[in-house]
């Protein structure tokens, strides 16, 4: 419509058949009482040189346009909100108690927790996000023939998923093992991508792929390229290389001088999680990896879970988690889903080697480790906000599944 009615620049595939088939062109279009609107419907015939279309010559396109009362298919997000009616928050100062100082492993099925996300240079303000924490059992998704767990929503409304594997009861919920970066003999190697190590600015030039990014990208190419249309290209994966408070990056002038990045303090390395204060914010655009961000550009819409996301989900640094486990390390049988696995969050430079946060499955806590060792890799990706819900209730036996379409939405 050109006079205030429904309008869109996207196209719907119309089936080519001798039998009349209903195709919905638009949902939730409304016309106020007493108002006249004019609509133009455009049909485009695609010229596909790989398909013999000679049978279509001389054929006629016909049909009827009509308006009917109906209900739009729910999005996956709307179904998640419906299935989890309870809202809660976690804080580092909840009436004097730090909720993030102890593991959250209580049953939380039916509850979504809320927080905010702000990406400096990308979002104009903080956006509310929903996340799962504790021992929830209804955040399972089956997508692209793999099982995933929902981590949270993102600033763009997309839904972030953590890889589980080919079955919900697996204990090998990873795509294999890789170093984060090899070698690890410079602070630049905490980067998912990185530049030269002259300064904090130059390591953020992001000209070189990390070892683990290359590993994940190859897996994506082999398994998920046909599903890219369902994935958000604006969702951000934050590889936070901000200096910690009181820390100075001076590697060029003093290579053996130790310093820590901001996640070291948010996870509270020094007092083992007692003052942990995780955040979904990303304070430098050059750390905010996404397909759309030219300052920190991904080749494919996939990366890793951050240490902050692990802390929000119920994990704590250097404190052993007992069963029942929080959802992010648990399979459907209640066992740990994977051996120790990488996060995306830098820890620091110890004067000789770079370190990154990981989930230590042997001790069941957040820990730091040299970037050069081989650890398990659990990819993370984000389903578009417009993705339609198909079936499922989020349980491992009946996971959420999405509507498959030509456009993705």
Range-by-range predicted roles:
Residues 1-14, 59:
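Surface-exposed interaction patch
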Residues 2, 7, 44-46, 68-70, ...:
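Predominantly extracellular/luminal cell-surface or secreted proteins
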Residues 7, 16-23, 31-33, 73-409:
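Long, domain-scale functional regions
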Residues 11, 28, 62-64, 147, ...:
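Well-ordered beta-strand positions in beta-sheet-rich domains
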Residues 23-74:
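C-terminal, structured domain-capping segment
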């Amino acid at each position: 419509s050109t006079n205030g009615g429904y309008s869109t620049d996207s196209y719907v595939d119309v089936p080519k058949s001798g039998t009349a088939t209903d195709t919905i062109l638009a949902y939730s279009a409304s016309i106020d009482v007493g108002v006249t609107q004019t609509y133009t419907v455009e049909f485009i015939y695609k010229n596909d040189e790989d398909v013999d279309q000679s049978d279509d010559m001389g054929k006629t396109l016909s049909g009827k346009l009509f308006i009917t009362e109906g209900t739009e298919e729910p999005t996956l997000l709307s179904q998640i909100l419906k299935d989890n009616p309870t809202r809660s928050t976690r804080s580092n100062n909840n009436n004097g108690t730090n909720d993030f100082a102890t593991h959250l492993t209580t049953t939380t099925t039916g509850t979504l927790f809320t927080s905010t996300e702000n990406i400096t240079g990308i979002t104009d303000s903080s956006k509310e996000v929903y996340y799962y924490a504790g021992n929830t059992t209804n955040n399972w998704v089956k997508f692209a023939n793999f099982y995933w767990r929902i981590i949270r929503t993102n600033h763009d409304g997309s839904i972030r998923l953590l890889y589980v594997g080919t079955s919900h009861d697996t204990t090998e919920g990873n795509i294999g093992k890789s170093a984060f970066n090899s070698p690890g003999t410079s602070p630049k190697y905490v980067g998912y991508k990185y530049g030269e190590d002259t300064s904090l600015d130059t390591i953020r030039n992001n000209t070189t792929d990390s070892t683990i990014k290359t590993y994940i990208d190859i897996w994506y190419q082999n398994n998920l390229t046909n599903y890219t249309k369902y994935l958000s290209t604006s969702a951000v994966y934050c590889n936070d290389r901000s200096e910690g408070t009181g820390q100075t990056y001076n590697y060029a002038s003093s290579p053996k001088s130790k310093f820590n990045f901001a996640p070291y303090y948010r996870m509270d390395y020094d007092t083992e999680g007692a003052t942990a204060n995780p955040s979904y914010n990303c304070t430098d655009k050059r750390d905010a990896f996404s397909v759309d961000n030219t300052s920190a550009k991904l080749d494919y819409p996939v990366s890793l879970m951050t240490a902050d996301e692990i802390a929000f989900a119920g994990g704590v640094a250097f404190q052993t988690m007992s069963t029942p486990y929080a959802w992010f390390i648990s399979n459907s049988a209640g066992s740990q889903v994977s051996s120790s696995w990488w996060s995306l969050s830098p820890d620091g430079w110890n004067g000789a080697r770079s370190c990154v946060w990981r989930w230590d499955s042997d001790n069941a806590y957040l820990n730091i480790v040299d970037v050069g060792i081989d650890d398990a890799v659990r990819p993370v990706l984000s389903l578009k906000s417009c993705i339609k819900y198909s079936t499922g209730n989020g349980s491992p036996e009946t996971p959420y599944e999405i509507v498959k379409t030509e456009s993705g939405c």
